[in-house]
Amino acid sequence: MSDYKSTLNLPETGFPMRGDLAKREPGMLARWTDDDLYGIIRAAKKGKKTFILHDGPPYANGSIHIGHSVNKILKDIIVKSKGLSGYDSPYVPGWDCHGLPIELKVEQEYGKPGEKFTAAEFRAKCREYAATQVDGQRKDFIRLGVLGDWSHPYLTMDFKTEANIIRALGKIIGNGHLHKGAKPVHWCVDCRSALAEAEVEYYDKTSPSIDVAFQAVDQDALKAKFAVSNVNGPISLVIWTTTPWTLPANRAISIAPDFDYVLVQIDGQAVILAKDLVESVMQRIGVTDYTILGTVKGAELELLRFTHPFMGFDVPAILGDHVTLDAGTGAVHTAPGHGPDDYVIGQKYGLETANPVGPDGTYLPGTYPTLDGVNVFKANDIVVALLQEKGALLHVEKMQHSYPCCWRHKTPIIFRATPQWFVSMDQKGLRAQSLKEIKGVQWIPDWGQARIESMVANRPDWCISRQRTWGVPMSLFVHKDTEELHPRTLELMEEVAKRVEVDGIQAWWDLDAKEILGDEADQYVKVPDTLDVWFDSGSTHSSVVDVRPEFAGHAADMYLEGSDQHRGWFMSSLMISTAMKGKAPYRQVLTHGFTVDGQGRKMSKSIGNTVSPQDVMNKLGADILRLWVASTDYTGEMAVSDEILKRAADSYRRIRNTARFLLANLNGFDPAKDMVKPEEMVVLDRWAVGCAKAAQEDILKAYEAYDFHEVVQRLMRFCSVEMGSFYLDIIKDRQYTAKADSVARRSCQTALYHIAEALVRWMAPILSFTADEVWGYLPGEREKYVFTGEWYEGLFGLADSEAMNDAFWDELLKVRGEVNKVIEQARADKKVGGSLEAAVTLYAEPELAAKLTALGDELRFVLLTSGATVADYNDAPADAQQSEVLKGLKVALSKAEGEKCPRCWHYTQDVGKVAEHAEICGRCVSNVAGDGEKRKFA
């Protein structure tokens, strides 16, 4: 028997079947770095329209976690897809380098500033620590396949950036948004510092819930208000609170002007309560026998005075819109030094902003004899005992409620009034302008808009001062006596900024005021405060984007971070940009959800359900991680587990196998010489290119809308359904058995070439390593890297006017599916071994029959059978299978007649008819020794 294997065009490629990504990717990365791939892309894109995705800086502390990976991969997918869409999209990664977490790390190792080290040496240690953290994180980000200017990232501790942060503050001061005040701010007693809104987390805490009676100073005035004369015992206004420790700072009781308040007689005293809450209060304090004596509106009680239960002074009843009927008594204990609402109403009524608590969370000397020096969280029981002793406690119980805690220490925080610097939301219309700017931004997903709007509408003034060592100095001088800013503040800040640009922030602490103030130095003091670290990152639109040459003065198009950044970076950036320039710093804001495990639980080291990106890359490769990110709908929580990553690896194999099939069958194809013109191609091949064209339209639209899971789904459908289970199956016969240089084969290779050119580009933003690998095996002249080009423009399809148009082939796909079902059943019944052992008769109604007949002898190639005939639907025998999908089709199967050709494996009756090639069929003889078979349709 002759060996006809050498006459076949078997697939061949050096592109490996297995990805071995964990082993291969580092080598590719080394090549990207050696070649300066990022620089090559920048040169290729020079002069194109820009798209700037501004990197929100991660904090330079600790290893990257899975959330970091999601964030950087999403950014990279966008930047690369924008590049392929014809944009110049530079990406400059950044890091947030100042602030408390770094200070705490350095303190752990070296002690607090001023102990073993001077403050200057401490700052140098912080700078050193941050730099090592940046290096560690940078390696991991690069390993993810993220392309950017890693050699020149921006760091908020770069001297120039530090100087520009000071300049940003100067601009805000110049625009009139800064003011000083003793306002209550979130205060962590462990950090001994004010906290930003975004540094506060909420946890359940158990606190005493108490009802306290404040006795009326003028009992007769109250009786007159309620129009009653007989009251048994003293009259009190009752407040309810879960923070007894704040009572020493009480300066008023807030009531609602429009609520009804009633005077209620209970045993031996009368109490004033909101009418709607009487029942719940009586139940709570265990009173069943009570009488309502009279009713008034809250407004009637304004400025009546009540005695503080133990502080020895009296306080007014005041009117406030923040009073609700959700819980309590309808009268709210008001301590302007311990709460933002209390502070605002206190300002309105000119109340003292009392702050009896020191930075360490203990009461200051002179507060109250039994409280001085006591930690506020240990004081609740002392205060409750005091109230009991004074006869003012109506009720106490333990209550679990959500309480603000420090994000770093996880310990409860307090509101504490301290002298601080604030960016005012309203004195120059910052709130109103910010709300207006929000409307001009595209928020993705769109619920982000309502979220940030409500935050901006309700937020207090922004406390931007911190009492820390490692941070950008506020660089202000205030008058010793008046505490007013120096009249030349803006000029002086610029002078400081110039020095910081040369020597870093230490220049401020080394500065002798005389150097820039001259004779005035004796009248002014340097403000020791540093800026809130959120001011550092929030001003990068000015300190980085406005000054980096690659951005050429263009504003950022997009900010992209986790959904917690509405109150973090998106907010601080919006505030600073609007305060500086009157406009938002971004055009689009995209947020992604948090990562959770396969059961939807939050990632936690204590549960042991964290997924380390480093482990995933070392085991499966970065492309698998990238594919998981892209295939997950990032608008909600993003589930990740070993099982989920395994599914991503399965999808990856499908895509890789498709790419490998294309490359293997392009063996020996030179696009410059072998390309077949569209009009001369086999119809099915043109259909396949048209499928790629339709897929490309969907994929590009999805990239444009940032719907990457749609990109992956469409890519998978193309590889698995349109190519894998239909086209690539059908063409194997023609590809392998036709004459090597025949139009039949070259037509097929032309289609595969166009498809491969398109596919490699669709993959590139997501499967960057694999796309680069595929690119290296594609035939024809090309640039060195897929990332420097644009989407493939060589695709074409079938015209709707053609008889065998897309609709024709869509129907053929269905027919093929129905025939496959019958073949599978026959295989299960052991009637045939494989589909080529079968011959089928398709009993079809006239319209479908005409389409099937049009394919002539080539119908069998579409169906992958050795024989295929078409007959009238009404002539179908009883054993023909009725199609479930196509009502006008029945399929009958029989064993193919004739012998199996050892070359093409088809069963045919002309095997051995040609003496010189006695073992093979007539079609194969033509392909081996004759002019080759002609194919028109399939």
UniProtKB/Swiss-Prot annotation:
Entry's Gene Ontology cellular component terms: cytosol
Cofactor list: Zn(2+)
Localization, UniProt: Cytoplasm
Any single GO BP term: isoleucyl-tRNA aminoacylation
Binding site for Zn(2+): 901, 904, 921, 924
Keyword annotations of the record: Acetylation, Aminoacyl-tRNA synthetase, ATP-binding, Cytoplasm, Ligase, Metal-binding, Nucleotide-binding, Protein biosynthesis, Zinc
GO terms, molecular function: aminoacyl-tRNA deacylase activity; ATP binding; isoleucine-tRNA ligase activity; tRNA binding; zinc ion binding
Motif 'HIGH' region, residue numbers: 58-68
Coiled coil: none
Domain of life: Bacteria
EC number per UniProt: 6.1.1.5
Gene3D superfamilies associated with the record: 1.10.730.20, HUPs (3.40.50.620), Valyl/Leucyl/Isoleucyl-tRNA synthetase, editing domain (3.90.740.10)
Entry note: cofactor: Binds 1 zinc ion per subunit.
Listed HAMAP family: Ile_tRNA_synth_type1
Subunit and interaction comment: Monomer.
Domain characteristics, as noted in the entry: IleRS has two distinct active sites: one for aminoacylation and one for editing. The misactivated valine is translocated from the active site to the editing site, which sterically excludes the correctly activated isoleucine. The single editing site contains two valyl binding pockets, one specific for each substrate (Val-AMP or Val-tRNA(Ile)).
Free-text function comment from the UniProt entry: Catalyzes the attachment of isoleucine to tRNA(Ile). As IleRS can inadvertently accommodate and process structurally similar amino acids such as valine, to avoid such errors it has two additional distinct tRNA(Ile)-dependent editing activities. One activity is designated as 'pretransfer' editing and involves the hydrolysis of activated Val-AMP. The other activity is designated 'posttransfer' editing and involves deacylation of mischarged Val-tRNA(Ile).
Protein name: Isoleucine--tRNA ligase
